[in-house]
Amino acid sequence: MGFLLLWFCVLFLLVSRLRAVSFPEDDEPLNTVDYHYSRQYPVFRGRPSGNESQHRLDFQLMLKIRDTLYIAGRDQVYTVNLNEIPQTEVIPSKKLTWRSRQQDRENCAMKGKHKDECHNFIKVFVPRNDEMVFVCGTNAFNPMCRYYRLRTLEYDGEEISGLARCPFDARQTNVALFADGKLYSATVADFLASDAVIYRSMGDGSALRTIKYDSKWIKEPHFLHAIEYGNYVYFFFREIAVEHNNLGKAVYSRVARICKNDMGGSQRVLEKHWTSFLKARLNCSVPGDSFFYFDVLQSITDIIQINGIPTVVGVFTTQLNSIPGSAVCAFSMDDIEKVFKGRFKEQKTPDSVWTAVPEDKVPKPRPGCCAKHGLAEAYKTSIDFPDDTLAFIKSHPLMDSAVPPIADEPWFTKTRVRYRLTAIEVDRSAGPYQNYTVIFVGSEAGVVLKVLAKTSPFSLNDSVLLEEIEAYNPAKCSAESEEDRKVVSLQLDKDHHALYVAFSSCVVRIPLSRCERYGSCKKSCIASRDPYCGWLSQGVCERVTLGMLPGGYEQDTEYGNTAHLGDCHESLPPSTTPDYKIFGGPTSDMEVSSSSVTTVASSPEITSKVIDTWRPKLTSSRKFVVQDDPNTSDFTDTISGIPKGVRWEVQSGESNQMVHMNVLITCVFAAFVLGAFIAGVAVYCYRDMFVRKNRKIHKDAESAQSCTDSSGSFAKLNGLFDSPVKEYQQNIDSPKLYSNLLTSRKELPPNTDTKSMAVDHRGQPPELAALPTPESTPVLHQKTLQAMKSHSEKAHSHGASRKEHPQFFPSSPPPHSPLSHGHIPSAIVLPNATHDYNTSFSNSNAHKAEKKLQSMDHPLTKSSSKREHRRSVDSRNTLNDLLKHLNDPNSNPKAILGEIHMAHQTLMLDPVGPMAEVPPKVPNREASLYSPPSTLPRNSPTKRVDVPTTPGVPMTSLERQRGYHKNSSQRHSISAVPKNLNSPNGVLLSRQPSMNRGGYMPTPTGAKVDYIQGTPVSVHLQPSLSRQSSYTSNGTLPRTGLKRTPSLKPDVPPKPSFVPQTTSVRPLNKYTY
């Protein structure tokens, strides 16, 4: 139980962590209001309907003062009485007209501006008090300001220059407000918009401004809002981030602060400039290992109280050259104040990075403080500040830390759409208890989003997208460009339950809720989660207001639980509701049964509109969105069971059941444990099978290894000795391993004469002469044996020829043998079976011949074949080591001759008798390279041919490289004196790699000709000739003396070469052949 509880805790922490670091997904709206429904909302265009001759509105700003809405545009200011509820069109009650003079327009045209720009666009409309309002306009690029009476909009007073109070161009942004009788404005102060300024004018005292052309203070700003709070005035804007100039041009959102009692600096420092100007970054980002920032501030609200905390809420977007993305972030004023009390940021050199300033380097009083308040309480005015403080604030206006959002994350994000959010308005007291916060956000596409905000970090629910409203009306508003669809501003009229959405050419009034759409469908009303709507006891869904009794309505804003409610099939909406048509269709994951909805296939109009405007909603229920369309009012009568003005939901019986969170977590845990168990069993079974397979493979490898001979005991049939032959040095000491083969079980003395070991008392060669040696035993690869079946007939003919022409057994020397009792060669030559053929010795012949010989040498029974095979392998390996010991010049011949009988028994050798009729089972390797001459007798035994110590030809490069010592005991290879053994014209041939070798090479120039038995032999004087094999040789292959090429194999003494029996040849030395 404790483990299960611990597991649940860990799972909860992991889920919380994932929710914190994962990028939020876009929510689908619970309700959608498209153009067909929103087109009924009243629109303000600045001119009466049908009068298209008047100019467009060119909306600039909108301000609500008490029960009047002021709309400023080009050359005019309109007033709208909010107490009058419009039906189809918003009619202004009053209008202020202020046009530019003719001279100003002509001057504007002379400056190169278009005539449409040379008008008076009202950019400033700020109340001075309850009676007067301060109005400024661009006045054809010559800004001017006036005072007007607020109630009558009559001109009062004289014109004032609008320089540094109003921009020159209507496309430039600006903000302004009165605080303590002084006008605080932020705009550009020149025609080219290069001098951005935050300016204070009017009232007592001198005018103050920011430092001109100082990028550390302001760099290409875009001012959005100004508010008064406490002893300060705050400006919200975006600008080019000066701290990231080295990394590129990036836009950051800023909040700047100045003291209302700032009087400027002394005559030495910051005279007529702000002494309290500070700015900090607004950080609106998605948390995680790598933050995703929304850096561009688009709009921000006034200070509102959210959960008792003074807060500003803004909408932020990504950079202009980035992917579209928007977020809504809230910042508390306390967090902003905290940042301004933090550390400063500085750049020591123009090329260095920006770093934080240590606290010990900050002068006293602290820069940014207001005189007579806080740390600067001892100073009456800012003029009295020390020069160190003024100099520091002049070069360090930027704070090091950024202002974090509430809960360190956005309230709402929108990233899966192609538009950005541009305007924001907040109702902080929504619902009958005024305890909900609803955010209205405008976008570039003319869509207004209605969001139920998550205002507490401990809230269990995230922000919910309640509605998506298409507020733009292309039929009544200008549609000249995509910019006309952009929402410029939003104004909330909570008293009259309305929201004014401003576009460049019109203003649309939309209600805050559409409770009448749900009609008498309780399930749709509750599922909407709209804090403005509730289900009344009268059986209708209507707007709930403050003061209604709790028992008089029902709503579920937190969860929208409708599991206990049935489907909607009841009555029709009130008669005051306009006609509707079907919009959309069932969601993508459900299908509407024919019994639930009756469709009319003969109505192409409804089909086209459904396809064009349908937006899928990924929910588990089937939903329809209904909206107004006067042209199809008769069509809705043909659809049975669909009430007008009702968002009708048809759900299956299974979807009404909800699963409790504990049950869901338990199921997930059980599934995880079961999956882990199954995975463990699968891994165990797989591992067991894999281990068994490896053991079987290992066992097969060992058995295959035991069936093979030593490295020098088989012939390579597929390549005819591709690699150079191993050669062994004569003076290698014999190991002590062979002492057990002797009768006396003692090692031979090192000075024992080995020559006497080779001859018995009858003068015959030793019986060991018939045994194969490592030098004369080729390597047989068994993998190529099956590929040589094509030569089986040759193998049979080869066996028959050997029966007809038996060979001499080496135990009795031939008549012309030069051997004597006192002399025996140090290497013993075996008869070569390949001399019996006139054709080339193929691989298959060798293989089958050896199989036949093996069957003759080992006539064992089937029952003991495996045991005898292993013993045979061990005997051959031991024999190889013994023969190495026999070749040792320091061996004792008497001890070896005395142990011949025991060696025969130990090595499991066959009697010598059968071998007199059958040749040795292993052919001579050197002799197999040649085809014997046709003139030689078949039965002639092979002879030992010794090479003299001093060769008759120059030493080869291989011999020079190996550095052999010249002594009488050294034996040279026959390849030192090449002899033609098979070529009819006596030419020395070099065997080169060839895929189709069938000819002879001509005699090379510069060759020395010798004669062996009357046949001219070409002796090549070059260092060496290569010997290669052929895979496709046909017919009789020429055999010739060979020369070895240098190789990378270890240095070993050369082995003797063997040739068929010939007549005696006397070279330059004393040896007899």
Curated annotation (Swiss-Prot):
- Which spans are transmembrane here? 663-683
Is Magnesium set as a keyword in this record? no
Its record classes its membrane topology as: Single-pass type I membrane protein
> According to the UniProt entry, which residues carry Phosphothreonine?
773
State if Disulfide bond is listed as a keyword.
yes
Q: Name which cysteines form disulfide bonds.
A: 108-118, 136-145, 259-370, 284-329, 477-506, 515-533, 521-568, 525-541
Q: Pull the Extracellular topological domain ranges from the record.
A: 21-662
Give residue ranges on the Cytoplasmic side. Answer: 684-1073
- The modified positions for Phosphoserine read 723, 734, 744, 931, 957, 983
List, alphabetically, the GO terms of the cellular component aspect: collagen-containing extracellular matrix; Golgi apparatus; plasma membrane
* Keyword list, A-Z: Cell membrane, Developmental protein, Differentiation, Disulfide bond, Glycoprotein, Membrane, Neurogenesis, Phosphoprotein, Signal, Transmembrane, Transmembrane helix
Question: What is any Pfam family matched here?
Answer: PSI
Which domain of life, per UniProt? Answer: Eukaryota
> Which stretches does UniProt call biased (Basic and acidic residues)?
790-806
Ranges annotated as biased composition (Polar residues): 931-942, 1021-1037, 1059-1073
Query: What residues bear carbohydrate chains?
Result: 51, 283, 435, 461, 631
Gene3D superfamilies associated with the record: ligand-binding face of the semaphorins, domain 2, YVTN repeat-like/Quinoprotein amine dehydrogenase
Q: Which residues form the signal peptide?
A: 1-20
Q: Name one GO biological process term.
A: smooth muscle cell migration
Cross-referenced InterPro entries, in alphabetical order? Plexin_repeat, Semap_dom, Semap_dom_sf, Semaphorin, WD40/YVTN_repeat-like_dom_sf
Domain annotation PSI: ranges: 514-569
Family statement drawn from the similarity comment of this UniProt entry: Belongs to the semaphorin family.
Q: Report the protein's function.
A: Shows growth cone collapsing activity on dorsal root ganglion (DRG) neurons in vitro. May be a stop signal for the DRG neurons in their target areas, and possibly also for other neurons. May also be involved in the maintenance and remodeling of neuronal connections. Ligand of TREM2 with PLXNA1 as coreceptor in dendritic cells, plays a role in the generation of immune responses and skeletal homeostasis.
Name of this protein: Semaphorin-6D
User: Which species?
Assistant: Mus musculus
